Protein backbone atom coordinates (compact mmCIF):
# COMPACT_ATOMS: atom_id res chain seq x y z
CA UNK A 1 0.00 0.00 0.00
CA UNK A 2 1.27 3.47 -0.78
CA UNK A 3 0.48 6.67 1.08
CA UNK A 4 0.10 10.22 -0.18
CA UNK A 5 2.40 11.48 2.60
CA UNK A 6 4.43 8.59 4.03
CA UNK A 7 6.79 11.07 5.70
CA UNK A 8 4.20 11.69 8.44
CA UNK A 9 3.94 8.01 9.40
CA UNK A 10 6.14 5.96 11.69
CA UNK A 11 5.62 2.26 12.15
CA UNK A 12 5.45 0.33 15.39
CA UNK A 13 8.83 -1.33 14.89
CA UNK A 14 10.54 2.05 14.35
CA UNK A 15 8.86 3.45 17.47
CA UNK A 16 9.90 0.45 19.56
CA UNK A 17 13.52 1.18 18.55
CA UNK A 18 13.23 4.99 18.92
CA UNK A 19 11.53 5.72 22.24
CA UNK A 20 10.45 9.16 23.43
CA UNK A 21 13.19 11.44 24.72
CA UNK A 22 13.74 15.13 25.42
CA UNK A 23 13.35 16.01 21.72
CA UNK A 24 10.77 13.36 20.75
CA UNK A 25 7.45 13.14 22.58
CA UNK A 26 4.89 10.39 22.23
CA UNK A 27 1.26 11.32 22.83
CA UNK A 28 -1.69 8.95 23.04
CA UNK A 29 -4.91 10.63 21.93
CA UNK A 30 -7.97 8.82 23.25
CA UNK A 31 -11.69 9.23 22.99
CA UNK A 32 -11.99 6.76 25.88
CA UNK A 33 -8.88 6.99 28.09
CA UNK A 34 -10.43 4.78 30.79
CA UNK A 35 -10.36 1.82 28.39
CA UNK A 36 -7.21 3.00 26.64
CA UNK A 37 -4.41 5.00 28.23
CA UNK A 38 -5.33 4.24 31.84
CA UNK A 39 -5.32 0.46 31.23
CA UNK A 40 -1.91 0.72 29.61
CA UNK A 41 0.01 2.84 27.12
CA UNK A 42 3.32 2.83 25.31
CA UNK A 43 6.14 3.63 27.70
CA UNK A 44 6.82 7.37 27.81
CA UNK A 45 3.51 8.40 26.24
CA UNK A 46 1.52 11.26 27.70
CA UNK A 47 -2.24 11.59 27.23
CA UNK A 48 -4.41 14.01 25.33
CA UNK A 49 -8.03 13.26 26.05
CA UNK A 50 -9.86 14.32 22.91
CA UNK A 51 -13.11 15.30 24.60
CA UNK A 52 -11.58 17.16 27.55
CA UNK A 53 -8.33 18.60 26.21
CA UNK A 54 -8.92 19.56 22.57
CA UNK A 55 -12.55 20.65 22.38
CA UNK A 56 -13.97 23.80 23.92
CA UNK A 57 -17.11 22.67 25.79
CA UNK A 58 -18.85 26.02 25.35
CA UNK A 59 -18.14 26.92 21.72
CA UNK A 60 -17.97 23.29 20.51
CA UNK A 61 -14.86 24.25 18.58
CA UNK A 62 -11.18 23.42 18.95
CA UNK A 63 -9.37 25.01 21.86
CA UNK A 64 -7.90 28.48 21.50
CA UNK A 65 -4.24 29.15 20.75
CA UNK A 66 -3.68 30.05 24.40
CA UNK A 67 -5.27 26.78 25.57
CA UNK A 68 -3.27 24.81 22.98
CA UNK A 69 -0.04 26.41 24.20
CA UNK A 70 -0.91 25.50 27.80
CA UNK A 71 -1.68 21.90 26.82
CA UNK A 72 1.60 21.57 24.92
CA UNK A 73 3.54 23.15 27.79
CA UNK A 74 1.94 20.70 30.24
CA UNK A 75 3.03 17.83 27.99
CA UNK A 76 6.63 19.08 27.79
CA UNK A 77 6.34 19.92 24.10
CA UNK A 78 8.06 22.89 22.47
CA UNK A 79 7.59 24.23 18.95
CA UNK A 80 10.71 22.26 17.91
CA UNK A 81 9.75 18.95 19.51
CA UNK A 82 9.11 15.95 17.28
CA UNK A 83 5.66 14.72 18.30
CA UNK A 84 4.36 11.25 17.48
CA UNK A 85 0.62 10.74 17.93
CA UNK A 86 -1.32 7.50 18.19
CA UNK A 87 -4.58 6.48 19.77
CA UNK A 88 -7.71 4.44 20.07
CA UNK A 89 -10.49 4.09 17.48
CA UNK A 90 -8.05 3.48 14.61
CA UNK A 91 -6.26 6.80 15.16
CA UNK A 92 -9.37 8.86 14.32
CA UNK A 93 -8.81 11.24 17.19
CA UNK A 94 -5.03 11.21 16.77
CA UNK A 95 -5.61 12.39 13.19
CA UNK A 96 -7.94 15.11 14.47
CA UNK A 97 -5.29 16.26 16.95
CA UNK A 98 -2.68 16.13 14.14
CA UNK A 99 -4.87 18.69 12.33
CA UNK A 100 -5.12 20.88 15.47
CA UNK A 101 -1.33 20.83 15.80
CA UNK A 102 -1.11 21.94 12.16
CA UNK A 103 -3.70 24.69 12.72
CA UNK A 104 -1.35 26.17 15.35
CA UNK A 105 1.78 25.77 13.23
CA UNK A 106 3.49 22.69 14.69
CA UNK A 107 5.54 21.15 11.89
CA UNK A 108 7.54 18.24 13.34
CA UNK A 109 4.63 15.86 13.64
CA UNK A 110 3.97 12.20 12.89
CA UNK A 111 1.32 9.51 13.43
CA UNK A 112 2.08 5.93 14.43
CA UNK A 113 0.63 3.87 11.61
CA UNK A 114 -2.01 1.48 12.95
CA UNK A 115 -2.47 3.15 16.34
CA UNK A 116 -3.14 1.26 19.57
CA UNK A 117 -4.78 -1.57 17.68
CA UNK A 118 -1.65 -2.44 15.68
CA UNK A 119 0.59 -2.13 18.75
CA UNK A 120 -1.72 -4.56 20.59
CA UNK A 121 -1.99 -7.01 17.68
CA UNK A 122 1.80 -7.22 17.66
CA UNK A 123 1.74 -8.06 21.40
CA UNK A 124 3.96 -5.12 22.24
CA UNK A 125 4.33 -3.98 25.84
CA UNK A 126 2.27 -1.39 27.64
CA UNK A 127 2.84 0.27 30.98
CA UNK A 128 0.57 2.04 33.44
CA UNK A 129 3.45 4.19 34.70
CA UNK A 130 2.99 7.89 34.13
CA UNK A 131 5.91 9.51 32.30
CA UNK A 132 7.92 12.16 34.09
CA UNK A 133 7.27 15.35 32.17
CA UNK A 134 9.14 18.60 32.59
CA UNK A 135 6.79 21.42 31.60
CA UNK A 136 7.92 23.55 28.68
CA UNK A 137 7.10 26.97 27.33
CA UNK A 138 5.24 26.34 24.08
CA UNK A 139 4.70 29.22 21.67
CA UNK A 140 2.28 28.45 18.85
CA UNK A 141 1.52 30.29 15.66
CA UNK A 142 -1.70 32.18 14.92
CA UNK A 143 -4.30 29.70 13.64
CA UNK A 144 -3.98 28.86 9.95
CA UNK A 145 -7.58 29.34 8.82
CA UNK A 146 -6.63 27.99 5.41
CA UNK A 147 -6.69 24.53 6.98
CA UNK A 148 -10.33 24.83 8.02
CA UNK A 149 -13.57 24.47 6.14
CA UNK A 150 -16.58 26.03 7.80
CA UNK A 151 -20.21 25.17 7.04
CA UNK A 152 -20.38 27.96 4.46
CA UNK A 153 -17.31 26.61 2.65
CA UNK A 154 -18.67 23.07 2.52
CA UNK A 155 -22.16 24.19 1.49
CA UNK A 156 -20.69 26.27 -1.31
CA UNK A 157 -18.82 23.28 -2.70
CA UNK A 158 -21.54 20.64 -2.47
CA UNK A 159 -23.50 19.86 -5.59
CA UNK A 160 -21.18 21.53 -8.05
CA UNK A 161 -20.76 18.83 -10.66
CA UNK A 162 -17.72 20.45 -12.19
CA UNK A 163 -15.91 20.08 -8.87
CA UNK A 164 -16.85 16.50 -7.94
CA UNK A 165 -15.12 16.12 -4.58
CA UNK A 166 -12.00 18.14 -5.25
CA UNK A 167 -11.08 21.41 -6.83
CA UNK A 168 -7.94 23.45 -7.01
CA UNK A 169 -8.75 24.97 -3.60
CA UNK A 170 -10.49 22.19 -1.70
CA UNK A 171 -11.00 18.49 -1.33
CA UNK A 172 -13.69 16.79 0.75
CA UNK A 173 -12.60 13.51 2.24
CA UNK A 174 -14.88 10.81 3.59
CA UNK A 175 -12.96 9.46 6.58
CA UNK A 176 -15.57 6.99 7.80
CA UNK A 177 -14.28 3.43 8.25
CA UNK A 178 -15.02 0.74 5.72
CA UNK A 179 -17.69 -1.77 6.66
CA UNK A 180 -16.18 -5.20 7.09
Where are the regions a protein language model picked out?
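Thiolate-centered catalytic microenvironments shared by cysteine-dependent enzyme domains
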Residues: 56, 62-160, 177-180
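Positively charged, proline/Ser/Thr-rich regional signature most characteristic
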Residues: 2-79, 155-180
